[in-house]
Design a protein with these regions (language model features):
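The −1 position to Zn-ligating cysteines in a subset of zinc-ribbon hairpins
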Residues: 159-162, 264
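Cys/His-coordinated zinc-binding microdomains
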Residues: 164-167
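Extended alpha-helical scaffolding segments
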Residues: 1-146, 173, 178-532
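Beta-strand elements of modular eukaryotic interaction domains
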Residues: 151-153
Length: 532
């Protein structure tokens, strides 16, 4: 029997970034106790950081649902109690030592990466699962197989095996973002799809320190409204589930969800390094209306006209900037389900400085071929005044949403212009490329405008100023498309269109550009309600 090795509470394995941008590896205990000293997590991929963050959040949720800041037993009893406890933690700006050490000391034996009976985030039954080498465990290498790389991040021994610290980080990532390549061992088992974190559009808040990030995402109230059931993280189970592809009820507490075992995994080691692993499908639940998940954007789904409306987690589009998802993430309409973390932060308005800037981040993995492999990972951020989320500022969010929708309409008009200009030169335009060009041009200006908004100031004036800027950017992009088309597009060409009687349509860049300007005017004057 191999020896017990590598306790995650004591050994360094979590990668953090200091304020001066230095990287360190620290233990789970140190990551929590010194979280106020770190700028944030700094793993190999943003998806890995989210997996580690959720583990840390599960620990904090469990502790502070049960005890106060001094470590004395004090279970949360109502919503006001939860908000007050969070407010006390936020005011401290650091996580209290005693309750954290008391809890981790009590559960130390459940945090061994290698253990003959209870290896962390693993089960012995997975030894019959699909076999993979260390390169597959390393998400950085696995993901990079789908790209041409001039310079490899790993080579030699580092490519064929992992340190225990690396393996621990990638173990969490694998549990959350694993693809669908593993073959089931049992017969007639359901398809579980990608790991839970790979199925959703991850959406979280970022603070100035790791401690702030943890507190902002420590959602003590479901959707900012009601208490969860008592916490029960995976490691507290008397007997962890080990069955292959097991459907479970929706978790009723955050600790259980944050430590969901989407996969059954068993790591193999040799001479102090991890050389491979075996894997089976693990726990899963229905995605429909799975509102226990607080860190995702949602989309409405209604398959039939009279069928009940349901919500599904919305995966992020890697080609879509986060500000373009503002309507889904922050909308006011009752028919839209905003992310739980957004509702939670809105509920904290009395405990936070209204002038505080909040940064939200989207994180995702882009899969290929029915989630059979990971093509890429991506992240994006969005920053604005916390006061924008107040219930008294619904009109502000409505105005921002409207401007996002106007930008989408402009992008469509730019695409139509590109197609028409190309026809004027005798070619076939690619509207998608032109739309992407417009979004690139307007991306940073929109972010700056959003960050500058203060709900206490004149929003109508801010909106008019933005519309003037957006219209100018659109004109510049449109003008560039016309100029790049060349002289032949200015002269134009005739196209015969067969619709009943013969009809001839004339294509010319000047004509197309004038129509484009008319479209801009129609978007902002007819639909916007104010002239620019």
């Amino acid at each position: 029997m191999k020896k017990i090795e590598f306790n995650l509470l004591e050994e360094p394995w979590i990668r953090v970034r200091t304020p001066d941008c230095a990287l360190q590896e620290v233990s789970l205990t140190d990551a929590l106790l010194h979280a106020h000293e770190y700028a944030g997590l700094a793993g190999e991929l943003p998806t890995q950081d989210v997996a580690v963050l959720r583990l840390l959040l599960a620990v904090l949720q469990t502790i502070f649902y049960r005890v106060d800041l001094e470590g004395s037993p004090s279970p949360l009893t109502d919503e006001e109690d939860a908000l007050d406890r969070w407010g006390q933690l936020w005011e401290e700006k650091r996580l209290p030592e005693k309750p954290i050490l008391d809890y981790l000391t009590a559960w130390r034996e459940r945090f061994w990466l290698f253990h003959p009976e209870r290896p962390f985030y693993q089960v012995l039954e997975a030894q019959i699962g699909t076999e993979y080498d260390a390169k597959k465990l390393n998400g950085e290498i696995s993901e990079s197989r789908n790209k041409d790389r001039l310079f490899q991040s790993y080579g030699g021994t580092e490519k064929d095996s992992l340190t225990y610290g690396q393996a621990a980080r990638w173990l969490l990532y694998l549990n959350g973002f694993d693809d669908t390549s593993a073959k089931p061992k049992g017969k007639g088992l359901p398809s579980v799809g990608a790991g839970w974190l790979g199925k959703i559009g991850l959406f979280l808040a970022r603070g100035n320190t790791l401690a702030e990030t943890l507190l902002l995402n420590m959602v003590l109230l479901k959707d900012g409204q009601e208490l969860w059931a008592p916490p029960c993280p995976y490691w507290e189970l008397d007997q962890p589930r080990s069955g292959e592809r097991t459907e479970i009820p929706l978790p009723d507490n955050q600790a259980a969800l944050l430590t969901l075992q989407s996969r059954r995994i068993f790591l193999y080691r040799e001479e102090g390094r991890v050389t491979g692993y075996r894997l089976l499908g693990g726990d899963f639940f229905e995605r429909e209306n799975s509102f226990c998940e607080q860190m995702t954007i949602w989309r409405k789904s209604q398959e039939k006209r009279n069928a009940p409306l349901v919500y599904l987690p919305l995966r992020h589009d890697p080609a879509k900037q986060l500000w373009r998802e503002f309507p889904s993430a922050f909308a006011v309409e009752s028919s839209t389900h905003t992310p739980g973390v957004v509702r939670w932060i809105a509920a904290l308005r009395d405990y936070m400085d209204r002038h505080l800037f909040i940064q939200f981040e989207s994180v995702g993995a882009a899969y290929g071929d029915k989630d059979f492999f990971v093509n890429d990972t991506f992240t994006d951020t969005l920053t604005f005044h916390r006061a924008v989320l107040d219930t008294t500022n619904t009109e502000t969010r409505n105005k921002i949403t409207q401007e996002v929708l106007f930008c989408e309409e402009i992008a469509e008009a730019v695409g139509d212009l590109a197609k028409e200009v190309a026809k004027s030169a005798g070619g076939q335009g690619v509207p998608e490329t032109a739309r992407a060009r417009f979004y690139f041009a307007i991306d940073q200006p929109f972010r700056r405008w959003l960050a500058s908004l203060d709900p206490e100031e004149d929003m109508d004036e801010a909106v008019l100023s933005w519309r003037s800027q957006a219209k100018g950017i659109a004109r510049q992009v449109g003008k560039a498309l016309v100029e790049e088309a060349g002289p032949s597009a200015l002269v134009g060409r005739c196209e015969k269109i067969k619709k009943g009687n013969k009809e001839i349509k004339y294509h010319a860049a000047p004509k197309a550009f004038n129509h484009f300007l008319w479209e801009l005017k129609k978007i902002y004057e007819e639909k916007g309600g104010n002239k620019v």
